[in-house]
Amino acid sequence: MNNPRHNIRDVRAPQGTELNAKSWMTEAPLRMLMNNLDPDVAERPHELVVYGGIGRAARTWDDFDRIVATLKDLNEDETLIVQSGKPVGVFRTHKDAPRVLIANSNLVPHWANWDHFNELDKKGLAMYGQMTAGSWIYIGTQGIVQGTYETFVEAGRQHYDGNLKGKWILTGGLGGMGGAQPLAAVMAGACCLAVECDETRVDFRLRTRYVDAKAHTLDEALALIDQWTKAGEAKSVGLIGNAAEIFPELFRRGVRPDIVTDQTSAHDPIHGYLPAGWTVAEWRAKQESDPKAVAAAARASMKVHVQAMVDFWNAGVPTLDYGNNIRQVAKDEGLENAFAFPGFVPAYIRPLFCRGIGPFRWAALSGDPEDIYKTDAKVKELLPDNKHLHNWLDMARERIAFQGLPARICWVGLGDRHRLGLAFNEMVRNGELKAPVVIGRDHLDSGSVASPNRETEAMKDGSDAVSDWPLLNALLNTASGATWVSLHHGGGVGMGFSQHSGMVICADGTDDAARRLERVLWNDPATGVMRHADAGYDIAVECAKEQGLRLPGILGN
């Protein structure tokens, strides 16, 4: 094999109750690692790329094989250490310790940039883990659908009296994360025009029912949008094109969407963003032969792209950055007012973070969709008054196609996550579920990320860049007994702009699991409430008091 990162084999997670490892605590990370590379889940699985430009699950195929072999042989009192996608050690710990500890793409701050990372990457010394790619808890595009839905719903509340019927959203990017936008828009009641340069990605979203139609010309796409909005229908179209060309053209034509955003992979100027005027084939070739030229051309195109977004904003169109760092690139390229429009977290999501509410998710290791439907019902039973959440679960069941192992995303917060975890564990114990479930979250959560251009943008106390919080979150989840814990750098917004942590815990129906679940699923969201209370948010302070958190330096208790 000439390229250690390319292999033609297909990987799929085992299903059912037969173990391939020594216990469910090691079977769980094994299955979720393999699930990340399922052809129905990953963007470029043969290259180990899960999503987000070059977000990988393992450094090389040899490393993947070594991780799999080690997990199969790992004892219940041992912990596997994974350094940027490479299994570097196994150490004796104890039964309540994590079975896997992962660190991906972390660099000393002075060297935390794409140029230095790319040098290490070429030498085989590093791997970009994105957020859930290298931490083995990616569940396909569903993983971001509800967060995007919540954002669009809140935008509708703020700007259109809570009604997006007859409205349409303009966006770019239909990759693993951006692909959620059309479906989220439709669920929120709006139409969506999503610009994507790679036709295979549009076809992937059509196949998985995340987008309703495909267009090859702007006129064709606008005709569909006009037809649907006039009829009051909520539908979406993926337009084959370049956002850096389409956005300015729409503005020049006098077309005014009702909401404008973008989720191209602008965080990675080489692998994530097609320069204006280039073909996809030319772009792919020059990524290898002349990456600096690609980056320069992409950055120049991003400046044009963001200028169009600023123009829409100045024209009165609600416009939001969706966390890909495109404003920062445009500013670095000389666009002084690139940050004229806000990021989605300070504009719409932060009140949820203040209560520890974020992208809680779980996957059925059995592979049986019925296990997810049963847990959906359990969520409704335990949270009977949360009709907004019930509506989400109903829409998710109807509209979201499972990718790989069946899974569910469900935004809940402190006080509810541990109750759900314990209930799922009991369902495994009594046989309601056919096999254990794993419970995790995105790194995009209330207490697990420092990202000044995204999750921690415009913090009330100016603590946007303080990254103690995700480090403490990872340490606390390790001490609390999560099944695997990860600490990453650069996810979402690229090298030098974020640090973040993840956790996953397996509910196998045992008493030991119940104790760990109660600790982890309380402590993890509690760190988010703590972080926001420390920053001076009244909602977080009130939540901390209601939940009885002991925060001596914040509450004085």
Curated annotation (Swiss-Prot):
Active-site residues from the entry: C410
Names of the cofactor(s): NAD(+)
GO CC annotations on file: cytoplasm
Key words, A-Z: Cytoplasm, Histidine metabolism, Lyase, NAD
EC numbers: 4.2.1.49
Places the protein is found: Cytoplasm
Pathway: Amino-acid degradation; L-histidine degradation into L-glutamate; N-formimidoyl-L-glutamate from L-histidine: step 2/3
Segments traversing the membrane: none
Signal sequence interval, chain numbering: none
A GO MF term: urocanate hydratase activity
Highest taxon above the source species: Bacteria
Binding site for NAD(+): 52-53, 130, 176-178, 196, 201, 242-243, 263-267, 273-274, 322, 492
GO BP term, example: L-histidine catabolic process to glutamate and formate
Enzymatic reactions: 4-imidazolone-5-propanoate = trans-urocanate + H2O
Cofactor note: Binds 1 NAD(+) per subunit.
Family membership noted in the UniProt record: Belongs to the urocanase family.
PANTHER family for this protein: UROCANATE HYDRATASE
Protein purpose: Catalyzes the conversion of urocanate to 4-imidazolone-5-propionate.
NCBIfam families reported for this sequence: hutU (TIGR01228), PRK05414.1 (NF003820)
Descriptive protein name: Urocanate hydratase
Organism: Agrobacterium fabrum (strain C58 / ATCC 33970)
Highest classification ranks of the organism: Bacteria, Pseudomonadati, Pseudomonadota, Alphaproteobacteria, Hyphomicrobiales
